[in-house]
């Protein structure tokens, strides 16, 4: 963000060549004019940035437009305005941005369940905490320091990619178990079961512990 406009554009064009070679979409953060100038695949907009409709008019119908959403209301509005995906967070405490408060995972899950478009978890996601996103129904994650703050960027990228795939697979398993078990558990105030679907316990106290201590 400290680069001059010309330097930023030159670097964006070089990155575009690289992402195009590997079939990876290039999404520019905030800057719609730059996204158009470098022929990026899309743009990500914050709550204080240009409206989705304006960005769409500039970039065209094929552009991928993402919007930051920190609660269900923002998520629903962005979806209504035509966003293609949401970036929600901060999922965890992050050092990349200052004065950012982590969302409860409950809120992240509520956002995912409220909209029909993909939701990407952003903020503080790392190799150490990514499995906490299992069951939140996120479609993916966005990271900075988890890769670029590491000594071996390529190694960190490969490791995190594998962990993301594993997290998404576990989420699919979690959702399948949920759909299977819920009809059997109607009327229960709280249940505890492991990831292979084995019911461990069913008592009202679990619901209290869930809300009061886990915050989910």
What are these regions (language model features)?
Residues 26-41, 55, 70-82, 114-121, ...:
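Catalytic cores of alpha/beta
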């Amino acid at each position: 963000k400290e680069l001059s406009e010309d330097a930023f554009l030159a670097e964006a064009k070089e990155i575009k060549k690289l992402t195009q070679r590997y079939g990876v979409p290039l999404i520019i953060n905030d800057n719609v004019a730059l996204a158009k100038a470098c022929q990026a695949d899309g743009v990500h907009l914050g709550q204080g940035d240009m409206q989705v409709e304006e960005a769409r008019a500039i970039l065209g119908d094929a552009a991928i437009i993402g919007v930051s959403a920190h609660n269900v209301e923002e998520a629903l509005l962005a979806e209504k305005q035509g966003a293609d995906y949401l970036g929600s967070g901060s999922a965890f405490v992050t050092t990349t941005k200052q004065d950012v408060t982590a969302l409860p995972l409950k809120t992240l899950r509520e956002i995912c369940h409220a909209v029909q478009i993909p939701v990407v978890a952003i903020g503080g996601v790392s190799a150490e905490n990514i499995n906490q996103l299992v069951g939140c129904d996120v479609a993916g994650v966005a990271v900075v320091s988890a890769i670029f703050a590491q000594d071996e960027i390529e190694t960190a990228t490969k490791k995190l990619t594998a962990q993301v795939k594993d997290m998404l697979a576990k989420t699919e398993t979690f959702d399948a178990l949920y759909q299977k078990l819920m009809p059997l558990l109607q009327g229960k105030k709280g249940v505890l079961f492991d990831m292979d679907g084995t019911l461990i316990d069913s008592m009202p106290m679990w619901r209290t512990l869930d809300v009061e201590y886990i915050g989910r």
